[in-house]
Amino acid sequence: MTNIRKSHPLLKIVNDALIDLPAPSNISSWWNFGSLLGICLTIQILTGLFLAMHYTSDTTTAFNSVTHICRDVNYGWLLRYLHANGASMFFICLYLHVGRGLYYGSYTYTETWNMGIILLFAVMATAFMGYVLPWGQMSFWGATVITNLLSAIPYVGTDLVEWIWGGFSVDKATLT
């Protein structure tokens, strides 16, 4: 008599993916970070969508909208903290994932490694845009301090900063 997890059509899919996964026996917990990245990204997207439903970007009402989210929205404080700490966890998992790849020599697979580097740069650019463009309390700081890092590039740094800003300086606390 066969086990139900191996004979039932739906349970067979779960069994083959989770229980009887054809993985080497020496696989360690270092290989979990890709899955953790997916979970963190899903949490970021969902909490970001729910937070965006209640957030206003005007300089006079942005702080009040964050206060409204934390006090009046059901579990709004939890959404805010999950979103803030989820970003940190995402990057911790990302750097550990890259570190694991360096440790185990995954850079020898050049096509895969180069695609990962492209994804890393895309994630960092997206995180920067997500930090600067929500048009919230930290936008002014994010736009000035992070982009001023480009001014360290010799000869063209200051021109790059002015080009990214679209002028000499960023104006208000929010970008509206």
Curated annotation (Swiss-Prot):
Pfam families: Cytochrome_B. The chain crosses the membrane at residues 33-53, 77-98, 113-133. One of its GO terms (biological process) is mitochondrial electron transport, ubiquinol to cytochrome c. GO terms for molecular function: metal ion binding; ubiquinol-cytochrome-c reductase activity. The keyword Amino-acid biosynthesis does not apply. It is a multi-pass membrane protein. Binds 2 heme b groups non-covalently. InterPro entries: Cyt_b/b6_N, Cytb/b6-like_sf, Cytochrome_b_N_euk/bac, Di-haem_cyt_TM. Heme b b566 binds at residue 97. Its cofactor is heme b. GO terms for cellular component: mitochondrial inner membrane. The keyword Membrane applies. Heme b b562 binds at residue 83. Component of the ubiquinol-cytochrome c reductase complex (complex III or cytochrome b-c1 complex) that is part of the mitochondrial respiratory chain. The b-c1 complex mediates electron transfer from ubiquinol to cytochrome c. Contributes to the generation of a proton gradient across the mitochondrial membrane that is then used for ATP synthesis. The cytochrome bc1 complex contains 11 subunits: 3 respiratory subunits (MT-CYB, CYC1 and UQCRFS1), 2 core proteins (UQCRC1 and UQCRC2) and 6 low-molecular weight proteins (UQCRH/QCR6, UQCRB/QCR7, UQCRQ/QCR8, UQCR10/QCR9, UQCR11/QCR10 and a cleavage product of UQCRFS1). This cytochrome bc1 complex then forms a dimer. Belongs to the cytochrome b family. This is Cytochrome b. It comes from Tomopeas ravum (Blunt-eared bat).
